Amino acid sequence: MQFPSPVPVQWIGDLIQAKITGNDKAYATGINELHKVEAGDLVFVDHPKYYEKCINSAADFIIINKETNVPEGKALLIVENPFEAYCKIVNHFRPFTPAEKMINDTSVIGEGSYICPSAFIGNKVTIGKNCIIHPQVSIMDYCII
């Protein structure tokens, strides 16, 4: 998930009540899972098995539950529960918005696409051209098809 605009890592640290070590003047551009991270992203790790992989990933900011050496240019955000901190950040930038109808007005449906009755299309969904969404299918918020 990309943030609407770059966010100071200090602000994120305050949000999740983290101790920051390393590059505390930088800006994060998004938050992602370990297998999807890019430069500028935040990622979390809460198991020793994945510490090295996470610290050496493309992510510039690592939410972690232990102090360790910080690679050049990166920052560690040290908290007791990294997953809880990760969820708090995601919920801040993408809070739950209840659906008020089956096909949300904020969604974009491509030319030639057909949505069958009883299909659910969530908030800010993008469906490309010439797609068929069958009955009883649910496409949740922010999905791109």
For the regions a language model picked out, list residue spans one by one:
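Structural signal for interior beta-strand "rungs" in well-ordered beta-sheet cores
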Residues: 44, 102-145
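Terminal amphipathic alpha-helical/low-complexity segments used for targeting or macromolecular assembly
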Residues: 1-106, 112, 130
